[in-house]
From Swiss-Prot:
EC nos: 2.1.1.45
Origin organism lineage: Bacteria, Pseudomonadati, Pseudomonadota, Gammaproteobacteria, Enterobacterales
Function: Catalyzes the reductive methylation of 2'-deoxyuridine-5'-monophosphate (dUMP) to 2'-deoxythymidine-5'-monophosphate (dTMP) while utilizing 5,10-methylenetetrahydrofolate (mTHF) as the methyl donor and reductant in the reaction, yielding dihydrofolate (DHF) as a by-product. This enzymatic reaction provides an intracellular de novo source of dTMP, an essential precursor for DNA biosynthesis.
Catalytic residues (UniProt): C146
Stored Pfam families: Thymidylat_synt
Example of a GO MF term: thymidylate synthase activity
UniProt-recorded name of the protein: Thymidylate synthase
Top-rank lineage group of the source organism: Bacteria
Substrates-to-products reaction catalysed: dUMP + (6R)-5,10-methylene-5,6,7,8-tetrahydrofolate = 7,8-dihydrofolate + dTMP
PROSITE patterns documented for this protein: THYMIDYLATE_SYNTHASE
Originating organism: Xenorhabdus nematophila (strain ATCC 19061 / DSM 3370 / CCUG 14189 / LMG 1036 / NCIMB 9965 / AN6)
Annotated positions binding dUMP: R21, R126, R127, R166, S167, C168, D169, N177, H207, L208, Y209
Length: 264
């Protein structure tokens, strides 16, 4: 994950001081891309321990179309707590948009099911896309989508994915985002009988919060270790039937975790 550390260093050295919605302040660059060959290992940051349980359960929660934090709480995940209302609801965030995008004529469009059908029936299509950026519902969301738009691409029997992330918290959020979408590519590839290719991450406003700078310097002092491997223990009947226990990360040898406050 040297490219992740290189990005942190770039933001520190070249970033512009900017105000932000949370009032914390950031150092920010605009427009950055990283490519991870998923054949070479699972891109889980090793220079600090990442909470894999949260990554997996959050993705399963998205895939189920859920927008209430009860499932997350039931599974020991608290990463969405700060944005939920008193009933645990977040409004029409990722799960709603991925699984039940509301059309102008009143239909609910299951974008993920459509993508699976395209990958199996028309893998050369240039329209294999999922968007969470529903302009008509942004004002109802507890938090506008940060990872907003992703596209799949099939070549030589391998499935690749590119994500556009309009806003990126490099220290806290980005390791989760990279691992989450890499996991999704593995799941999609298994369902479509494809090998995994690349995960391409593209960032818009790519920033370090001012209260994460000390932690960033600590992380940059650590030498990256070998990437772990992902094992999927079974092939469910559909993308929506995976369970937490289906996944195992082997040979993950990270440095200790580094705590940092979340900007809300």
């Amino acid at each position: 994950m040297k490219q992740y550390l290189d990005l942190m260093k770039k933001v520190l050295e070249e970033g512009t001081a900017k105000d932000d919605r949370t009032g914390t302040g950031t150092r920010s660059i605009f427009g950055h891309q990283m490519r991870f060959n998923l054949q070479e290992g699972f891109p889980l940051v090793t220079t600090k321990r990442c909470h894999l349980r949260s990554i997996i359960h959050e993705l399963l929660w998205f895939l189920n179309g859920d927008t209430n934090i009860k499932y997350l709480h039931d599974n020991g995940v608290s990463i969405w707590d700060e944005w939920a209302d008193e009933n645990g609801d977040l409004g029409p965030v990722y799960g709603k948009q991925w699984r039940a995008w509301g059309s102008a004529d009143g239909r609910h469009i299951d974008q993920l099911t459509q993508v699976l059908e395209q990958l199996k029936g028309d893998p050369d299509s240039r329209r294999i896309i999922v968007s969470a950026w529903n302009v008509g519902e942004l004002d109802k969301m507890a938090l506008a989508p940060c990872h907003a738009f992703f596209q799949f691409y099939v070549a030589d029997g391998k499935l690749s994915c590119q994500l556009y992330q309009r806003s990126c918290d490099v220290f806290l959020g980005l390791p989760f985002n990279i691992a989450s979408y890499a996991l999704l590519v593995h799941m999609m590839a298994q369902q479509c009988n494809l090998d995994v290719g690349d995960f391409v991450w593209t960032g818009g406003d790519t920033h370090l919060y001012n209260n994460h700078l000390e932690q960033t310097h600590l992380q940059l002092s650590r030498e990256p270790r070998a990437l772990p491997k992902l094992v999927i223990k079974r092939k469910p009947d559909s993308l929506f039937d995976y369970r937490f226990e289906d996944f195992e990360i082997v040979d993950y040898d990270p440095y200790p975790g580094i705590k940092a406050p979340v900007a809300i």
